[in-house]
Amino acid sequence: DFTVDYFVGRFLGIDDEGLKRSLIEEFYPICKRLSSQKMVCTHRDFHSRNIMMKGDEFMIIDFQDARLGIPQYDLASLLEDCYYDLNEENRELLKRMYFEKLPKEVHGQKDYEQFQELYRDMLLQRVFKAVGSFAYIYHHRKDHRYLKYIGFAMEKLKLAMLDQPDLESLKTKLFNLYYDS
């Protein structure tokens, strides 16, 4: 509801409540799949701007949003960070390494394909939420710097939904809203 309110309603200026509700309903199966997975402690705001250097050591900051989430949450948050573009080769290498190093008891997936499917769902949810956050910041602070991140995030979503027949309806609604508004 947050992203639909700030991105669709306030940023795009669309007041059609039925359309907003249908967009939320498109995300319901994704959220249901994610919420049925094994949960672990997650940072929930794990991106490049929250990783700092102190001397020769990395420090992670901004823990106030820590909650339970699936193991892919922080991974998708970092690798699909809207503040920088990690190339696909490195993204895939890091996903594969994460899957192989994390004990199966923690991630709970039977194979890498299942891990990837949940990663994709997490990417969609996390990046869509980021779109809402950028729209919120723009709306309340009038900070134009965040407008470029909305576009960057929408392109990430478009790539993630490419060749995904199960997401055709969501893709059509979301991108008709964004690119035709």
Q: What residues fall within each predicted segment?
A:
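Active-site activation/catalytic loop segments of kinase-like enzymes and analogous catalytic loops
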Residues: 2-11, 71-108, 121-141, 153-160
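Activation segment
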Residues: 54, 58, 66-68, 84
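Histidine/acidic-rich helix-loop-helix segments that form or flank divalent-metal centers
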Residues: 108-117
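Conserved active-site aspartate in kinases
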Residues: 62
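ATP-dependent phospho-/nucleotidyl transfer catalytic cores
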Residues: 1-43, 52-55, 59, 148
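ATP/Mg2+ or Mg2+-diphosphate-binding catalytic cores
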Residues: 132-181
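Secondary-structure capping and boundary motifs in well-ordered enzyme cores
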Residues: 38, 43, 67-68, 116-124
